[in-house]
From Swiss-Prot:
Organism field: Dictyostelium discoideum
Observed phenotype of the null mutant: No visible phenotype.
Region (Disordered): 350-426
The protein's name in its UniProt record: RUS family member 1
Protein's UniProt keywords contain Transmembrane: yes
């Protein structure tokens, strides 16, 4: 229970304080007496709101967390609805698989022995335990960040395991044990993946630190669904007996298996996780690029997610690899120099064309003047000749001066470019040194360092903000740029800069950012 503030409300012209529970339902009313009365008499109990004892409210109290729907996230009902249906289908198919396994053990066969059945049962259980341990060792760290994917994969493996159990009695006794072991291994992996991801999803649904309550009510829902599934399984088993054809049995199994996969997909798709893994980060940046800098919400990204087949190689690269930062900078500088050189060549060509046109026009004008002035006196001819000579001399002098100035400018530009290259290279080396010494950054795959050599594969996607204003300014242009281009392109590659407000906007949209590696002043974004 909680008190919904201390505001007073007027009900039937009586000042009172209303007490509400977590589901925002009124449970008690207290009359507010005069402030001049004694302290003990200021609050008078007015009435208690009796709870509705209807069947619907009883079901809500039995199977829904306390305070529903305010105590859980908005996607809770959609997930639980489809998850309950898929659990029902799984119970029915599990009954058919168990029936096939018992038949393979020799139930109903007078020649079968108890010792043989016990030995086979123990071997199956042992193989399942080994498969559970190996899977937890290999994929345990991936279950948290890809909980939706593994939640759906777990049910696929469960169906594969039951399919192997269904076909195992159809073969000889020598193949029954290996096929049934494969089926149990798949179901054991489903138990690990499904159980771990279920815990992760339950933590997501628990909105008010009510993880235990949400988990307990989820267990109650699952138990009730299993009871209903057992009743339906008894009905299905009564129609499917030893005299039923194999085709009918498999049609029933495939129908409930398909329905199980469909409902499970709808359940996982309804979940709107707010944590950011590598795949969801790719979708966020892709949405950011193609929607003019707008930030997507968790519900929008949930609609774009491919649950089962996530991309393996990302065509958007955030920043540059730590090992390739120097090489990428050199390639970028070469592209810039090529672009500037091409621009200077075009400008020089246009200037030369203009100068040639001007000289041709001057020559034509001089010829016309000479033809028109043939009948003039000798003094005018001498003056024209002298003027032409002086003009040519001056033009030559000006051209030489212009050429010298252009050469000087080109030399200055080359010197400036060389100085910039040297400065950039020094900055790049300083960045690498500071990043190697710092621990305030996170990488997508793992923290791995063999000796003093940083492995390139461990720095595939990195977003960092280190301590110190100098370091921040130095690395900002490298790690806060989304580069979606190929370096072999002749054109200057486009970039979209992401400032520090980008991550604040992510938080405003409801995304949860992992800040476990926070330092005193810097902060880190990642998974």
């Amino acid at each position: 229970m909680q008190y919904n503030g201390k505001s007073q409300q007027s009900i039937n012209k009586i000042n009172c304080i209303i007490e509400k529970n977590q589901s925002n339902s009124i449970i008690n009313k207290f009359q507010v007496a005069s402030p001049y009365d004694d302290y003990d008499d200021r609050l008078n109990f007015l009435e208690t709101i009796e709870k509705n004892s209807g069947f619907y409210n009883v079901l809500c109290e039995l199977f829904l967390p306390n305070g529903y729907p305010d105590s859980v996230t908005t996607d809770y009902f959609g997930y639980q609805f489809w998850d309950s249906i898929q659990a029902l289908c799984s119970t029915i198919t599990g009954t058919l698989a168990t029936r096939a396994i018992l038949k393979g053990y020799g139930v109903g066969d007078s020649s079968a022995t108890v010792a043989s059945a016990t030995t086979q049962w123990l071997i199956r259980d042992g193989m399942g335990m080994i498969g559970r341990i190996v899977f937890a060792w290999r994929k345990g760290t991936d279950l948290d960040c890809n909980s939706k994917k593994w939640r759906y994969t777990a049910d696929i493996l469960n169906n594969i395991g039951m399919a192997f159990e269904m076909i195992s009695p159809l073969f000889s006794s020598q193949l029954f044990l290996p096929l049934s072991c494969i089926g149990l291994i798949a179901k054991s992996i489903c138990g690990v993946a499904g159980g771990c991801t279920k815990a992760s999803l339950t933590q997501h649904f628990a909105k008010r630190d009510n993880l235990a309550d949400v988990s307990a009510k989820d267990g109650s829902q699952e138990t009730a669904v299993n009871l209903v599934g057992m009743l339906l399984s008894v009905i299905v088993s009564s129609f499917i007996n030893d005299n039923t054809s194999l085709i009918v049995t498999w049609l029933v199994f495939l129908f409930f298996t398909s329905l199980h996969l469909f409902c499970n997909y709808r359940a996982v798709s309804a979940v709107q996780l707010k944590s950011i893994n590598r795949y969801r980060a790719y979708l966020i940046y892709d949405y950011f690029i193609h929607n003019q800098g707008s930030i997507p919400s968790p519900s929008e990204i949930s609609k774009l997610e491919n649950i089962l087949f996530s991309i393996k190689e990302l065509d958007i690269r955030v920043g540059v690899s730590l090992c390739n930062i120097y090489k990428v900078q050199q390639k970028q500088q070469k592209l810039n120099n090529q672009f500037l050189q091409q621009k200077l060549n075009n400008i020089t060509k246009t200037k030369n064309v203009n100068n040639n046109n001007n000289n041709n026009n001057n020559n034509n004008n001089n010829n016309n003047n000479n033809n028109n002035n043939k009948n003039n006196n000798i003094n005018n001819i001498n003056n024209n000749i002298n003027n032409n000579i002086n003009n040519n001399i001056n033009n030559n002098i000006n051209n030489k001066n212009n050429n010298n100035n252009n050469n000087n400018n080109n030399n200055n530009n080359n010197n400036n470019n060389n100085n910039n290259n040297n400065n950039n290279n020094k900055n790049s080396l300083e960045i690498i040194k500071k990043i190697k010494k710092s621990k305030s950054f996170i990488i997508w795959k793992k923290h791995s360092q063999r000796g003093n050599k940083i492995l390139e594969k461990d720095f595939t996607l990195l977003i960092a903000l280190l301590n110190g204003s100098t370091t921040r300014d130095m690395i900002e242009s490298y790690f806060y740029a989304v580069e979606y281009f190929h370096l072999s392109s002749v054109q200057i590659p486009p970039t979209i800069n992401i400032s520090g407000t980008f991550f604040k906007r992510l938080e405003e949209k409801g995304w949860d950012l992992d800040r476990a590696l926070l330092n005193s002043e810097g902060w880190t974004f990642g998974i």
